Amino acid sequence: MAFVGYVVWQRNPTFDTITCKIWNIVDAEGKERITAFTNPDGQASVAWLDKDEKKRITAGTLADGEASVQCLDKDGKGRIVAATLADGQASVQLFDKDRKLRISAATLANGQAGLKWLDKDGKLRIAAATLADGAGVQWFDKDGKARIDAVTRDDGEASVQWYDKDEEIRIAAATFADGEAGVQWFDKDKKVKIAATTFPDGTVILPTKDDNPPKKP
């Protein structure tokens, strides 16, 4: 490997400075494998090239603190792209060989975050997010119908719901901040068939014979 550097010579009345602008690392055949440059204002970038001199990894920073990195396949298609912004936001995306988005994740400056996973047809299959007071996740079938929905909150409350292929709720479970918890199972006619509840004092209500959910005595 060989190193080639380009410099700019700048003279002023009190001292001399040398500012490196571009670096190139070449292989034994004289092909560029790594290139990098910096600007006096803080911008910088670096790229790694394969033996065919195609860029495979690139990264850069801007003067305001923003930065990005990208991984490319042998055909020059971006497969992974990540970036951070000056205000603290950040994101990452993953693409398949057909350049279709498969995974996307992002965080905001306030700590909120989200993630999406898509199938090969570009349909959303999993979505997850964190909010200021909790978090949630959803799972979708191949027809784009929500099948599972779960949520948690910072106060200890949480719930999960399961839906059938007709998007009718079949199972619902929840816990509350005071320690109460319950679960219900519905038949295809939306009637409650099983309902159980627990209370903070240790009371447990088991399923009843009718279609109505139990009530605390």
Residue locations for each model-derived region?
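Single-pass membrane-anchoring alpha-helices
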Residues: 1-12
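N-terminal segments that cap or nucleate solenoid repeat domains
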Residues: 13-40, 45, 209-217
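Thr-biased low-complexity repeat/linker tracts and other Thr-enriched repetitive architectures
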Residues: 39-203
